């Protein structure tokens, strides 16, 4: 609406030429040649421009595919160690999106196939973090599915098509964006066949799920209910082509190392048998590096499913040194996160070296890998984070080994006084 009324100097109200609000309804009214615009309309215009710029930047960055070395370098900023897995993932992801960029070119005789990825590694070794970081780096939709909740269609549980629906939700049901996304299916080892022999009874959460995932991973057109799902059954289903969706499956595969060792150490019997001591046994990570498709079949994955995951990357168990690095070095390291939380209260947080070693040792004892580090720190810092917001004179908190072990409380350093002696926790 264009306002043609006289200005305030003539005793009349001024109105925004865009939304029609008077000068009393808004905080600010900016005058131009015969027009006015309010602060609310300016904010709205800024939001529209910002969204369009972000979309244009995302589109241009999608065309600028980083090289495998650049991908691996960015992964180094967030994931400690696992160099072999990073290299395998970087090459696989680079080739996948290079293939997508090639598909629009006409008169191309060679059709490039899709290479989905299988990550094998102990709990807390960084499988999910690697997949999340890749998706963030490439600016593509990403979703995580839990294989343990999946069942065959018609049974209680989630259908495999629900995975695609989650991916659509991540990109506001933009089918074109979803068709270039990444899906990470966790706990894939939990849907292994319960025995080597085909069972007479139906295995709806094991082999049945593998069969259901086959076509989805290889490439099919999945029918997914739109927003609202069953609430609006009259709506047409969305058709999502999964041929260009990159599937990354991950699992701990506990016991797989024994299958590999049995295969690799198979030898003669009697006098021809090679004698080995228990000390000569390989570590889990070393054994997993020698995995072959047949080992996965013996573990319980069906051959057709293994064939759909041609790229194999194994992750090593994290030792104490790696866990200490994880605590301190990545961009989003846990010690940096907690230091930021304390900084918001105007307090410095310091972790002594012996404290970091103690945290790493406790995580190793729990066999939770890097995933257990946060729960340990959360338990140690809980009381301090509860008290600090109520105390305005604390300038620094120091955590040492005795605090992690539970034999003393964190050392609080006050602004204008000597720090009090540490007090043992109440019995």
Swiss-Prot record:
One of its GO terms (biological process) is proteolysis involved in protein catabolic process. The lineage of its organism: Bacteria, Pseudomonadati, Pseudomonadota, Gammaproteobacteria, Pseudomonadales. Zn(2+) binds at residues 16, 19, 38, 41. It comes from the Bacteria. Pfam families: AAA_2 (PF07724), ClpB_D2-small (PF10431), zf-C4_ClpX (PF06689). One of its GO terms (molecular function) is protein dimerization activity. The keyword Iron-sulfur does not apply. PANTHER family: ATP-DEPENDENT CLP PROTEASE ATP-BINDING SUBUNIT CLPX-LIKE, MITOCHONDRIAL, ATP-DEPENDENT CLP PROTEASE ATP-BINDING SUBUNIT CLPX-LIKE, MITOCHONDRIAL-RELATED. PROSITE patterns: CLPX_ZB (PS51902). Belongs to the ClpX chaperone family. The keyword Metal-binding applies. Keywords: ATP-binding, Chaperone, Metal-binding, Nucleotide-binding, Zinc. Transmembrane segments: none annotated. The gene is clpX. HAMAP family: ClpX. ATP-dependent specificity component of the Clp protease. It directs the protease to specific substrates. Can perform chaperone functions in the absence of ClpP. This is ATP-dependent Clp protease ATP-binding subunit ClpX. It comes from Pseudomonas savastanoi pv. phaseolicola (strain 1448A / Race 6) (Pseudomonas syringae pv. phaseolicola (strain 1448A / Race 6)). One of its GO terms (cellular component) is HslUV protease complex. Component of the ClpX-ClpP complex. Forms a hexameric ring that, in the presence of ATP, binds to fourteen ClpP subunits assembled into a disk-like structure with a central cavity, resembling the structure of eukaryotic proteasomes. ATP binds at residues 122-129. Residues 4-57 form the ClpX-type ZB domain.
